[in-house]
A protein has these predicted regions:
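Short, acidic/polar
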Residues: 25-37, 81-97, 143-146, 167-168
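A short, structured active-site edge motif that brings together acidic residues
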Residues: 68-81, 103-109, 163
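Beta/alpha (TIM)-barrel catalytic core signal, keyed to glycine-rich beta->alpha loops juxtaposed to Asp/Glu
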Residues: 109-275
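N-terminal binding-site loop/beta-alpha segment at the start of enzyme catalytic domains
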Residues: 1-71, 122, 189-190, 256, ...
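Residues at the N-termini of beta-strands
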Residues: 44, 100-103, 134, 158
Length: 275
């Protein structure tokens, strides 16, 4: 069994390639989920102000007794707070019971309002102040990313986007890579595997490797060079999703899964969403 892999971000910081997402988890259930995840081997946890569970995440980390330098904690700036990122991050840190986060992300560009460049400039300052180690974005399209780079000279280290076998976003993934922006997949299993887990190629690979369809899809993300954050609060599934280090998909198998792409977006359109 190989060890969990880490990715080196373009600012030099290291990020676990596989983490636990906690979207929709309540403050109480997230505590047991994180404790289970830590026991299994996860060290990266992805939350957000909008998830309203940062307090639970903070309680879980505080009570777990794991050294802070072993953890990689991500949270996100919500749309309504794009004019007050400094205050928003300090509120998040208070709930998380942390002095800093490892990664702070702008949750959505909200281009119709047009504050994301100013918000990004504030994140640059927050990084300089040591309140976040790295800074990035979620759901940014190429024009949004290009504008950040053109106007501030600083590229995000991460662009976290909806990405799964039915929505592979290969052009955006490639653009990110060209600009040394690491792509991170949210909803990596296409919201519980609907339309993915029943695909013939996924079943064939699951049989071949003695794995579940979810493990095959997570391994596809890893072998495609993506950071991936499957969400679960179910102990057995948390463990299952992390048990992916003893096999790899070969090139032909990655190509076969690539053919499942339908451009099927399950979440909001980043050009329209104003949340």
């Amino acid at each position: 069994m190989t060890h969990p892999t880490v990715i080196k971000l373009h600012d030099g910081n290291l990020m676990p390639q596989l983490g636990l997402g906690v979207w929709k988890a309540g403050n109480e259930e997230v505590v047991s989920a994180i404790h289970k995840a830590l026991e299994v081997g996860y060290r990266s946890f992805d939350t957000a102000a909008a998830y309203q569970n940062e307090t639970g995440v903070g309680n879980a980390l505080h009570s777990a007794g794991v050294n802070r330098d072993e953890l990689f904690i991500t949270t996100k700036l919500w749309n309504d707070d794009q004019k007050r990122p400094h205050e928003a991050l300090k509120e998040s840190l208070s709930k998380l019971k942390l002095d800093y986060v490892d990664l702070y992300l702008i949750h959505w560009p909200v281009p119709t309002i047009g504050h994301y460049v100013e918000a990004w400039q504030a994140l640059i300052e927050l990084q300089q102040q040591g309140l976040t180690k790295s800074i990035g974005v979620c759901n940014f399209q190429v024009p949004h990313l290009q504008k950040l780079i053109d106007e501030t000279g600083v590229a995000p280290v991460i662009n976290q986007i909806e990405l799964h076998p039915l929505m592979q976003q290969r052009q955006l993934h490639a653009w990110n890579a060209t600009h040394k922006i690491q792509t991170e997949s949210w909803s990596p299993l296409a919201q519980g595997g609907e339309g993915v887990f029943d695909q013939k190629v996924i079943h064939q690979l699951a049989d071949k490797y003695g794995k579940t369809p979810a493990q095959i899809v997570i391994r596809w993300h890893l072998d495609s060079g993506l950071v991936v954050i499957p969400k679960s609060v179910t102990p057995s599934r948390i463990a299952e999703n992390f048990d992916v280090w003893d096999f790899r998909l070969d090139k032909d198998e990655l190509v076969a899964i690539a053919k499942l792409d339908q451009g099927k977006r399950l979440g909001p359109d980043p050009d329209q969403f104003g949340g």
